[in-house]
Amino acid sequence: MRELDLLSRIYDSAVGLPDRVDIPPGDDMGAVRIGDSRVLVSVDQLADTVHVDLDATSIEKVGRKAITRSLSDVAAMGSLPCGAVVAACLPRDFGEERANSLFDAIRCTAEAYNCPVFGGDIAMWDHPMLLTVTVLAGGDGIAPLLRCGARVGDAVCVTGRLGGSQVPVDGYTHHLDFEPRLATGRALAAGKPVRPNCMIDLSDGLAQDLAHLCRASVVAAIVDADDLPVSRGAHALAADDPTKLWQHAMGDGEDYELCFTVTADKAAHIVGREVQGAVVSRVGTIIENDGGPSVRLRLPDGTIQPIDRLGWEHRGK
Amino acid sequence: MRELDLLSRIYDSAVGLPDRVDIPPGDDMGAVRIGDSRVLVSVDQLADTVHVDLDATSIEKVGRKAITRSLSDVAAMGSLPCGAVVAACLPRDFGEERANSLFDAIRCTAEAYNCPVFGGDIAMWDHPMLLTVTVLAGGDGIAPLLRCGARVGDAVCVTGRLGGSQVPVDGYTHHLDFEPRLATGRALAAGKPVRPNCMIDLSDGLAQDLAHLCRASVVAAIVDADDLPVSRGAHALAADDPTKLWQHAMGDGEDYELCFTVTADKAAHIVGREVQGAVVSRVGTIIENDGGPSVRLRLPDGTIQPIDRLGWEHRGK
């Protein structure tokens, strides 16, 4: 049983949804019209033993991550967070002080990103902690960026540096400490001279998430290994074998960076520059969908490798 | 560690929420303004071994209940469901066929109540199933009914019959098979001659949920044991001791009926009548908060018992 198979079953059944569903399942956020407003919604689970290790992580960082990874979805739509509701299922022996620290961290993180927690549900059981965060967002006049829309010839760009998000470097562990790219996503979506054709956040690894973009847009992509911006964590992992650098940059999950495609002329305005705190790198090009693999990698020696689904399917791991 | 203590910590911290949070934590649904719309949101968890027993329940009924118990919150606000997102954490050995049946049941139930599932998240782990359903609703011109607003002299009313929701009677098991009181809640909220002063849905048992209403409204309530509408399930449980009838009607959880208070003149229009498929019963009266227990029960012999917190705290059981 693979989570992607289950998800695709849900997406396939999106046919026949009522008109008020503006963005059906399959994007970083879904959207529904309520009154005159388009309301974007995403839901993410943070499970002890799956997405986080409570034995090895401070409770404050767990609470923080529960919110920031949901906000990464909002960033990917170029939208603004409006509020969140949080459900928690806690082991009975979790401890009240620890529970309070957890909720304080969740609330403070959410407020810091202007995303107040305005509802929730708490249950207790004899199994590991599971947090479920639902975030609501609005476009406030800017159309959300979807996964579909990439066109042949588009530059494939990413923010920040990729790979090795689990590796602590000088006290910073990216998958716990990252800043969701809300300001960058918003600036890209709002800026006519740079507005991407499509966008996604990198949670499963560039190989897999770029493949999602390609499939949604019915195109393919070629990535240049030499152009990948590699994180310090990935450098640490590949210290004994630099040829592994691109594997970590393409395959590791939980970068929580943005990946987008943009026309070549727009790309010229932003590639190599900082957009609201994040440096944009061009890593490849959108090519025609010829029925082959969605994502291909051009290695330094010029050979081209198919790399669909190299990414880390972290939710089901 | 009690879930109510944790919840009250979250509610207390609602002070200082931004203006766009219309309904802070503590009601059946919270609400936030997005654009020009007020968006109501509730989140509920359905955990195997806590809220449902997967070994003893068909997967279709599990999927159904995940949606209907969330819709009961919408009914309690007198609002209209707009859509839902569903997060599922499934044991790795759950089985694909069973997972598909579960999602089909969730989707079909949601669609039947005009509440399309437009997003979700799936994870897998080595622990029991946990479903988390977030429902969005709108007022569509009708102000939502809150828990606060009960006034001294109000009639305390309920819909349907109470207690014994776990007991199968002629193939009907209320906690699995109930219809959320969406049409009744809406008719009450929308009807000026009958609009309640406050409303809640009965998930933790009348004693506890009425106490929530009283605390939110800073009043108390007196309930007449003789006036309680008792379900067939509760009758079955109290067959050997009819004095236990009121205990089941007041204390058992998961009725998913509506409890509301309404001025005496408005009550005359609806008590003993059917409102959109649900018979309304008057079970008591709102009295002043004199610092004593929030809810008191007048027994058939005229004695009065305090019964705060008799209800079933099902989420933490």
Predicted segment positions?
Chain A
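Extreme N-terminal cap/leader segments of soluble proteins
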Residues: 1-58, 77, 86, 108-109, ...
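Small-aliphatic-rich amphipathic alpha-helix that forms the alpha element of a beta-alpha
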Residues: 59-83, 104-112, 187, 191, ...
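Glycine-/charge-enriched secondary-structure boundary and capping motifs
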Residues: 1-15, 92-118, 124-131, 136, ...
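Short helix-loop capping/hinge motifs at secondary-structure junctions, enriched
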Residues: 37, 140-145, 267
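Short, acidic (Asp/Glu-rich) active-site segment that either coordinates a divalent metal cofactor
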Residues: 40-43, 128-130, 144-189
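A generic local secondary-structure boundary/capping motif
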Residues: 19-20, 29-30, 107, 118-124, ...
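Solvent-exposed alpha-helices and their adjacent loops that cap or buttress functional pockets
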Residues: 22-24, 32-35, 110, 123-128, ...
